[in-house]
């Protein structure tokens, strides 16, 4: 009998369970097996738990945010080798289809492309994970970067970095970011690299507002109730030049376009539990450009370089650490936003 391991598994709607499964094996020449050293819980995992991700397959190991050590590689893998410390990209991508060649890797057309890990195939809240297309999905961690510093490179930081990149931010802009959760903060860190004139962070949770003020004092903060008037008072052209919606609520979706100036860019980063309405009659004349900022993992090597250079630091987001054996406690803490939690690291 092959080696078995502990995994956190999607059993059915509303139910995850810690259980034993066989250790994964190579299934394709482009696969790698990674010993997971550190994983994290993402809000997308909660969406799976609550049945909001129809493509999620019951029985799979959840988790798509992790780092680890390469244990074994397929014969076609060239960029990583056993012993390498690596980040794991949430998106699997072949590197060869139309969308991959354009750099839109989250739209990879391969059957294992897109968000597969922890959704359609076994993910990384486990001791080991099989990573398809390892040359594309794994990035070597620089020696000077710790696992904790690199933990978010393949998911929430990739999301924030991609969203900032497609938002066409200039140094003259007022940028509004709605939502100061983990992805919102990673979006903030990525926007700060663009050096806009001012950044406004909108958040309803006072503890998260305190976190922003403590760590990023140059950023203006405001509650949702006061956001519209505050943005009007702190922008030159009747609203924000760029709005990034990272909160994922019906009210924040509306707030995003309301706070945008005419001809602004509104980038929707959030994942919603239900359909949203775009009230075109109310918006008529604003001539807004909407973009969607789903995670795209083509910049992970660049973000690792920026971390190594000290230009991005996501480690303060890790407020709690649990062993895999206590992952149910970690989920309860994260889902209920207790004790000032922002992100939880899970030692596997």
Model-identified regions with their sequence ranges:
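Glycine-rich cofactor phosphate-binding loops and adjacent beta1-alpha1 units
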Residues: 167, 192, 209-289
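Mid-domain Rossmann-like dinucleotide-binding core that forms the NAD(H)/NADP(H) cofactor-binding site
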Residues: 140-225
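C-terminal hydrophobic helical "lid"/dimerization subdomain
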Residues: 1-5, 204, 229-230, 254-258, ...
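Glycine-rich beta-strand-centered segment in the early N-terminal region that forms part
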Residues: 24-39, 52-101, 142-145
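NAD(P)H dinucleotide-binding glycine-rich loop of Rossmann-like/cofactor-binding domains
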Residues: 96-178
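Local beta-strand N-terminus motif with an aromatic residue
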Residues: 83, 172, 218, 239-240, ...
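Short, well-ordered coil/turn residues at beta-beta hairpins
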Residues: 38, 89, 244-246, 348
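Conserved acidic E/D residue at the C-terminus of a beta-strand in Rossmann-like folds
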Residues: 203, 270, 294
């Amino acid at each position: 009998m092959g080696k078995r391991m502990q995994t956190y598994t999607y059993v059915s709607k509303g139910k995850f369970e810690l259980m034993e499964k066989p250790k994964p094996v190579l299934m394709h020449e482009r696969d790698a097996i990674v010993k997971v050293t550190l994983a994290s819980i993402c809000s997308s995992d909660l969406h799976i738990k609550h049945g909001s991700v129809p493509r999620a397959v019951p029985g799979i190991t959840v988790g798509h945010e992790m780092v680890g050590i390469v244990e074994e590689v397929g014969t076609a893998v060239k960029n990583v080798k056993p012993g390498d410390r690596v980040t794991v990209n949430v998106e699997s991508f072949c590197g060869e289809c139309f969308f991959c060649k354009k750099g839109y890797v989250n739209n990879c057309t391969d059957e294992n492309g897109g968000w597969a890990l922890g959704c359609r195939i076994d993910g990384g809240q486990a001791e080991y994970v099989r990573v398809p297309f390892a040359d594309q999905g794994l990035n070597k961690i620089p020696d000077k970067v710790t696992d904790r510093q690199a933990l978010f490179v393949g998911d929430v930081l990739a999301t924030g970095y991609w969203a900032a990149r497609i938002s066409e931010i200039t140094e003259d802009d007022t940028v509004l970011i709605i939502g100061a959760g983990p992805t919102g903060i990673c979006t903030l860190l990525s926007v700060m690299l663009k050096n806009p004139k001012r950044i406004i962070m909108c958040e309803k949770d006072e503890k998260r507002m305190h976190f922003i003020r403590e760590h990023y004092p140059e950023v203006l903060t405001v509650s949702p109730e006061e956001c519209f008037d505050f943005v009007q008072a702190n922008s030159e052209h009747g609203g924000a030049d760029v709005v990034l919606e990272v909160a994922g609520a019906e009210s924040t979706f509306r707030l995003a376009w309301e706070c945008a100036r005419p001809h602004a860019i509104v980038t929707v980063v959030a994942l919603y539990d239900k359909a949203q309405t775009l009230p075109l009659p109310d918006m008529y004349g604003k001539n807004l450009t909407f973009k969607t900022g789903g995670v795209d993992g083509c910049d992970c090597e660049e973000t690792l370089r920026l971390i190594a250079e000290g230009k991005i630091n996501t480690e303060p987001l890790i407020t709690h650490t649990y062993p895999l054996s206590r992952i149910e406690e970690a989920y309860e803490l994260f889902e209920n936003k207790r004790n000032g939690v922002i992100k939880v690291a899970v030692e596997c």
